């Protein structure tokens, strides 16, 4: 076993897929070591939600970093969205996913379950851009600085 007592996750991302985020959330939740999340540059969309999964007290954000929170969107792979039952089902599913991930983010930041969902809704569902100070005010970031990390590495490979 490693002597490492915390796992750093460095984030500089325009965001990504909600289902990939779900996989990362499960990995973090099942990890026996605490996770420190560190935003360098930007964390947008799914990356912003991932940032909130750092252990309380271990969420770092660079002074000039930015965070952007937005509702989950969907695409059927073309510029045209098909009307009818498919769209209704997909829209309902997206709303359930939005409430779920924003509920998790709210819990991670010590807020009521609907805190971030309500914030986005109050902004007419527009993208919400925050600087590091604003992230600290909402308890998304715990520190407005990048942590000093010392890395010692050893690799042992054996073939039998």
Residue ranges of predicted features:
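N-terminal organellar transit peptides
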Residues: 1-46, 53-160
């Amino acid at each position: 076993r490693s002597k490492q007592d915390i796992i750093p996750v460095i984030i500089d991302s325009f965001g990504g897929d909600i289902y990939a985020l779900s996989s990362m959330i499960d990995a973090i939740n099942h990890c026996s070591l605490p996770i420190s999340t560190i935003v360098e540059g930007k964390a947008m969309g799914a990356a912003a939600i991932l940032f909130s999964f750092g252990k309380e007290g271990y969420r770092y954000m660079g002074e000039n970093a930015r965070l952007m929170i937005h509702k989950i969107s969907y695409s059927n792979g073309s510029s045209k969205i098909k009307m009818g039952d498919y769209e209704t089902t997909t829209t309902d599913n997206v709303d359930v996913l939005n409430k779920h991930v924003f509920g998790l983010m709210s819990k991670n930041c010590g807020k009521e379950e609907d805190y971030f969902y309500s914030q986005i809704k109050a902004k007419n569902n527009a993208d919400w851009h925050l600087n590091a100070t604003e992230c600290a005010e909402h308890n998304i970031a715990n520190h407005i600085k990048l942590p000093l990390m010392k890395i010692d590495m050893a690799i042992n490979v054996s073939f039998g």
